[in-house]
Amino acid sequence: MAYPFQLGLQDATSPIMEELTNFHDHTLMIVFLISSLVLYIISLMLTTKLTHTSTMDAQEVETIWTILPAAILVLIALPSLRILYMMDEINNPVLTVKTMGHQWYWSYEYTDYEDLCFDSYMVPTNELKPGELRLLEVDNRVVLPMELPIRMLISSEDVLHSWAVPSLGLKTDAIPGRLNQATVTSNRPGLFYGQCSEICGSNHSFMPIVLEMVPLKYFESWSASMI
């Protein structure tokens, strides 16, 4: 999860987030090299008064600075497209959970079970227990099995929302009248926090998301107790 004064990304918990982190590092290195080259050229131009006459009109140079940026863009685009297709692909999910956004709470329905649905509201600050996080804790957590592909169906009952859990690499818009889907897969157990990431009204900041990823046997026990 996030911590105060954090500069980097949250620790990756899903294969998709691991790919996104690697892509971020890959792109950042390219940007760093380009910035270093530009600063070097600018410093040379500022510190020398000599002019190379052949560079005033050089077809070779113009060809290079046309082809080189195109090649760099390809190096950025190819891994980006790969991850984009990975995020959109859902293979044989073991569980489907329908998520509906409301002003200002989330409701969840486990479509593979009868009558397993609940609303999830933020816990007010004055009701927090020791160890719980302010503005991030909810009264009903979303319990899911770890290391298994889970399909999330996401929509909204009123205005635009966005269901986002950074450590899982998830951010999917909740649009009224439209059903979007995303894949949830966690490599380890734990609590993972997110929030609504689309400004949706005065209480937009008070729509937290808490996923509790547990081993399959614990999930089966929890689901049996909820039905």
From Swiss-Prot:
Binding site for Mg(2+): 198
Transmembrane portions of the chain: 15-45, 60-87
Domain of life from the UniProt record: Eukaryota
GO CC annotations on file: mitochondrial inner membrane; respiratory chain complex IV
Cofactor note: Binds a dinuclear copper A center per subunit.
Gene: MT-CO2
Topology in membrane: Multi-pass membrane protein
Keyword hit for Lipid biosynthesis: no
Organism of this sequence: Conilurus penicillatus
Keyword Ion transport on entry: no
CDD domains documented for this protein: CcO_II_C (cd13912)
Name assigned to this protein: Cytochrome c oxidase subunit 2
Entry cofactors: Cu cation
Mitochondrial intermembrane face residues: 1-14, 88-227
